[in-house]
């Protein structure tokens, strides 16, 4: 009997040939690390440790405190990510130049817009309520609305992030006792690194928005104090900081003693002899000139 013929005469199974399954047991310490794709599938399903769900902070203070410190691997949200359902192409990016105030559609119907008359404004898909310049924006908040929805401003500040260099929180004070609410908002602005501006009416709030936009390209010289460069003006400014010493007294002292060195070393009697100065002004000036810079504890 030929064994080869017997094998040929056997009925062959229909369909593709079945594959043998090899089971490779793994010890507990040989479980592949997370993120590494194993070469073989284990017969046992290793238990994956459950990760604790990240709880979103409820206030801006918690949000600011829980952020990672600055470093090579630290990631800090900037607030530039578009919100859910928001088209990124419709969002005005920081640095985009515009001659108008860009108003968020969420401010539609705000009475403040009726008083923005001196500068143009238009609606646009932006993260803040008002974009006042290339690096300036504003969030509007009514204290009456804040008392009803205290979490609203926390969420807005989180979404805004650090998108703009100057971030203004424009608050309309429309309640009778605003002290406690303003105290909380002031702390929040310190944490958020934004400027708190108070307005007692919608008209005043509109003027603030107009002013920020109108002075967008103006230098800061208008806000800075003009300092005189000549010696007489600067010496007069220094001496008039003493209580009850005016510009006339300052000019008399400089004309009498000739220099600040002679004035500083003069006695109380010499100061009192100056015309128009008197003993009381002389005593105050002498005490200021001879007061130590550092207070010595007694």
From Swiss-Prot:
GO molecular function, one term: single-stranded DNA binding
Positions where N-acetylmethionine occurs in the chain: 1
Skewed-composition ranges (Polar residues): 87-99
Keyword set, alphabetical order: Acetylation, DNA damage, DNA repair, DNA-binding, Isopeptide bond, Nucleus, Ubl conjugation
Motif Nuclear localization signal per UniProt: ranges: 17-23
Residue pairs linked by disulfide bridges in the UniProt entry: none
A Pfam family hit: HHH_5
Residues making up the signal peptide according to the UniProt record: none
Role, per record: Non-catalytic component of a structure-specific DNA repair endonuclease responsible for the 5'-incision during DNA repair. Responsible, in conjunction with SLX4, for the first step in the repair of interstrand cross-links (ICL). Participates in the processing of anaphase bridge-generating DNA structures, which consist in incompletely processed DNA lesions arising during S or G2 phase, and can result in cytokinesis failure. Also required for homology-directed repair (HDR) of DNA double-strand breaks, in conjunction with SLX4.
Protein name: DNA excision repair protein ERCC-1
Source organism: Mus musculus (Mouse)
Protein encoded by which gene: Ercc1
